[in-house]
């Protein structure tokens, strides 16, 4: 590689890193994910998303105006062929607090789920319970997961298509028992950016198919649909994500979100009256997450 090519590659990496850091910081601020004195359990699976999340949170810890702790937890589920040495070696080099939790959920899942069927749902429930228990044992105030913007959009359509709900994956979530706060710092980050960043950084990726489970076909088809839209209609994915942040309950059909029953004349409805008009659809999709100028600096974030 020539000197100019090296310089260009470094410039692109710096630009990508700044974008991911900026988007992570913005999500943390928008959803008040991290507060003074938090002890955050970073769930590291060995995939590209969780490695990138740890990188982003470590940077945020260095530059944030508040103090908080990070510690890493990995769940070794005893899948055949799981490279047990990879994560300890990586984390030792980072000099970060971590714990490897060993739980043989693989045997439990394979005993219950017929061969050839997807095990992801049961595996996820078992994993969640173990992580909640570990968070409590280790005094975590927040649990950080590596889901990104594309995961959230895919989940929105999966729930609409197969669950009959207008529901996605929230950037911040309270567990059902009210004991654990889950945060997703990469909520504003694109999967393509994360993939590129993880590749350039050379993270020791552990494949997610060690269990031999079939990929969730519904999610696979939804991902393919969104990829096709993105290729054919640039900006559509960004517009969908923007829509998730601009909900108008009075223009949907959920009586629990908006009191249609007691709606009276003389009231001003948020979102405007379009009952007799054609909806005002912009010709160009809203793209709130366009790449900013390459020279832009990382946003300074007040997390207090």
Swiss-Prot record:
SUPFAM superfamilies: Adenine nucleotide alpha hydrolases-like. It is found in: Cytoplasm. It comes from the Bacteria. The keyword Zinc does not apply. Pathway: tRNA modification. Gene3D superfamilies: HUPs (3.40.50.620). Keywords: 4Fe-4S, ATP-binding, Cytoplasm, Iron, Iron-sulfur, Magnesium, Metal-binding, Nucleotide-binding, RNA-binding, Transferase, tRNA processing, tRNA-binding. Its EC number is 2.8.1.-. Its main location: cytoplasm. [4Fe-4S] cluster binds at residues 120, 123, 211. It catalyses: cytidine(32) in tRNA + S-sulfanyl-L-cysteinyl-[cysteine desulfurase] + AH2 + ATP = 2-thiocytidine(32) in tRNA + L-cysteinyl-[cysteine desulfurase] + A + AMP + diphosphate + H(+). One of its GO terms (cellular component) is cytoplasm. GO terms for molecular function: 4 iron, 4 sulfur cluster binding; ATP binding; magnesium ion binding; sulfurtransferase activity; tRNA binding. Binds 1 [4Fe-4S] cluster per subunit. The cluster is chelated by three Cys residues, the fourth Fe has a free coordination site that may bind a sulfur atom transferred from the persulfide of IscS. The keyword Lyase does not apply. Its cofactor is Mg(2+); [4Fe-4S] cluster. One of its GO terms (biological process) is tRNA thio-modification. Homodimer. The thiolation reaction likely consists of two steps: a first activation step by ATP to form an adenylated intermediate of the target base of tRNA, and a second nucleophilic substitution step of the sulfur (S) atom supplied by the hydrosulfide attached to the Fe-S cluster. Catalyzes the ATP-dependent 2-thiolation of cytidine in position 32 of tRNA, to form 2-thiocytidine (s(2)C32). The sulfur atoms are provided by the cysteine/cysteine desulfurase (IscS) system. This is tRNA-cytidine(32) 2-sulfurtransferase.
């Amino acid at each position: 590689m020539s000197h100019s090519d090296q310089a260009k590659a470094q410039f692109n990496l710096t630009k990508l890193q700044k974008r991911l850091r900026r988007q992570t910081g913005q999500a943390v601020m928008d959803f008040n994910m991290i507060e003074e004195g938090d002890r955050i359990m970073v769930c590291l699976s060995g995939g590209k998303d969780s490695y990138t999340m740890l990188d982003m949170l470590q940077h945020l810890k260095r530059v944030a105006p508040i103090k908080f702790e990070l510690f890493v937890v990995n769940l070794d589920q005893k899948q055949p062929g799981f490279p047990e040495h990879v994560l300890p070696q990586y984390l030792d080099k980072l000099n970060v607090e971590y714990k490897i939790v060993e739980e043989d959920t693989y045997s439990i899942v394979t005993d219950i789920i017929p061969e050839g069927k997807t095990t992801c749902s049961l595996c996820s429930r078992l994993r969640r319970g173990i992580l909640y228990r570990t968070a409590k044992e280790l005094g975590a105030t927040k649990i950080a997961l590596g889901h990104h913007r594309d995961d959230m959009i895919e989940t929105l359509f999966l729930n609409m298509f197969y669950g009959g709900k207008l529901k996605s994956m929230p950037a911040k979530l309270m567990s059902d028992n009210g004991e654990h706060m889950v945060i997703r710092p990469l909520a504003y980050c694109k999967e393509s950016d994360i993939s590129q960043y993880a590749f350039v950084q050379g993270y020791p990726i552990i494949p997610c198919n060690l269990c031999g489970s079939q990929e969730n076909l519904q999610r696979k088809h939804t991902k393919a649909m969104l990829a096709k839209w993105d290729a054919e209609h640039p900006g559509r994915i960004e517009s969908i994500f923007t829509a998730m942040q601009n909900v108008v309950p009075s223009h949907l059909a959920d009586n629990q979100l908006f009191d249609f029953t007691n709606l009276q004349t003389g009231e001003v409805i948020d979102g405007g009256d379009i009952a007799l008009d054609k909806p005002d659809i912009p010709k160009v999709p809203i793209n709130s997450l366009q790449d900013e100028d390459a020279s832009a600096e990382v946003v300074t974030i007040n997390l207090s």
